Amino acid sequence: MVNLESMHTDIKMSGDVADSTDARSTLSQVEPGNDRNGLDFNRQIKTEDLSDSLQQTLSHRPCHLSQGPAMMSGNQMSGLNASPCQDMASLHPLQQLVLVPGHLQSVSQFLLSQTQPGQQGLQPNLLPFPQQQSGLLLPQTGPGLASQAFGHPGLPGSSLEPHLEASQHLPVPKHLPSSGGADEPSDLEELEKFAKTFKQRRIKLGFTQGDVGLAMGKLYGNDFSQTTISRFEALNLSFKNMCKLKPLLEKWLNDAESSPSDPSVSTPSSYPSLSEVFGRKRKKRTSIETNIRLTLEKRFQDNPKPSSEEISMIAEQLSMEKEVVRVWFCNRRQKEKRINCPVATPIKPPVYNSRLVSPSGSLGPLSVPPVHSTMPGTVTSSCSPGNNSRPSSPGSGLHASSPTASQNNSKAAVNSASSFNSSGSWYRWNHSTYLH
């Protein structure tokens, strides 16, 4: 009795209330009969104390239960020593698994509520929790699981296997949506490569961008402009339109290379003529018969610039088109201007410089009067009729336009200089036959 009461104050583990009661009942049978009433009284006290200690130990971690069996002695706690150790061995990895995720507080509360009836009923309820733990931890990402595995090295290998398998399969759905985007850059590279190849092969075959559009319209029924083909080669179209246009261009290119002599592929419009290159069709040169040309010459002499009604009448008489007659009169007037240009245009009187010789040779030579020796003081020089107030300079020679007068220019200049030095007087001479 003394030993049981002294050990009661040091018990800190939780056990089944029924097992402890049975153990004490076996001890009470060994004692003498006269002490039975004392044992019953102590049994009630210990039962109440054990129930209080059970609630206190449940509030702490189960790891404190390992202190209890060390204080037990003898065969009295043999029944309590076997089952709590097995329970602790099974609860130790479970407690670490429960504490790993932060959102499983409800699970820990469920564990505490299940441990109150007894330790034997606790073990079968907690056995399925490793499977539930693996199911609850599947949504977590791989890095989170790795950090938890390093933070809790006490986890057994069997509990880490479902987490590692889940971490391997988790990144797969994240990359699935980007698989479509990974194909798009490859398609863009293929389109860029095809556009460059298409341009080179098209130029090699001798087709223009407009030829490709017209040929595709005749062959496949889809007309494309030159701008569309140009934008495709420059990658200026949208991705969707380029994907639609690529198979058609590829088909046309293969047909053009396989059968370049095919008239359906190399149509006449594929090779533009000279008129199409310059943008307008050149008209054929009009040839007019000789008798009609003579008639038109007579009408031109009568009226160089006929009206529209007169041109219509001439065209009807000569059985010609009105536009042809009009153009002929226009060309004839231009020809007349080129022929009679010096006669038709009046000549303004030029202002001569004293040191220059007139270059015009059509006006005829100037008549230069002789310089007499009996008149030493006179100086004869020519001046323009419109420049009467301005005499010529003393050093100027006789102005002439003929080659003979220009050759004698130096001699006349010497004579005029000597006469100027002797007399110093000036005379102006206007030639009556000098016409401008």
From Swiss-Prot:
A cellular component annotation (GO) from this entry: nucleolus
Protein's GO biological process: epidermis development; keratinocyte differentiation; negative regulation by host of viral transcription; positive regulation of transcription by RNA polymerase II; regulation of transcription by RNA polymerase II; wound healing
DNA-binding region: 281-340
Any single Pfam family the record assigns to this protein: Homeodomain
InterPro entries cross-referenced by the UniProt entry: HD (IPR001356), Homeobox_CS (IPR017970), Homeodomain-like_sf (IPR009057), Lambda_DNA-bd_dom_sf (IPR010982), POU (IPR013847), POU_dom (IPR000327), POU_domain_TF (IPR050255), TF_octamer (IPR000972)
Keyword match Nucleus: yes
Keywords: DNA-binding, Homeobox, Nucleus, Transcription, Transcription regulation
Main subcellular location of this protein, as a coarse class: nucleus
Free-text tissue specificity from the UniProt record: Specifically expressed in epidermis and cultured keratinocytes.
Composition skew (Low complexity), residue ranges: 258-275, 381-397, 405-421
POU-specific domain ranges (all copies): 183-257
Disordered: annotated span: 1-40, 140-186, 256-278, 363-421
Subcellular location: Nucleus
GO molecular function annotations of the record: DNA-binding transcription activator activity, RNA polymerase II-specific; DNA-binding transcription factor activity, RNA polymerase II-specific; identical protein binding; RNA polymerase II cis-regulatory region sequence-specific DNA binding; sequence-specific DNA binding; sequence-specific double-stranded DNA binding
CDD domains for the chain: homeodomain (cd00086)
Domain of life: Eukaryota
Keyword DNA-binding: yes
Annotated family: Belongs to the POU transcription factor family. Class-2 subfamily.
Subunit structure: Interacts (via the POU domain) with POU2AF1 and POU2AF2 in a DNA-dependent manner; this interaction recruits POU2AF2 to chromatin and increases POU2F3 transactivation activity.
Function noted in UniProt: Transcription factor that binds to the octamer motif (5'-ATTTGCAT-3') and regulates cell type-specific differentiation pathways. Involved in the regulation of keratinocytes differentiation. The POU2F3-POU2AF2/POU2AF3 complex drives the expression of tuft-cell-specific genes, a rare chemosensory cells that coordinate immune and neural functions within mucosal epithelial tissues.
Protein's recorded name: POU domain, class 2, transcription factor 3
Annotated source species: Homo sapiens (Human)
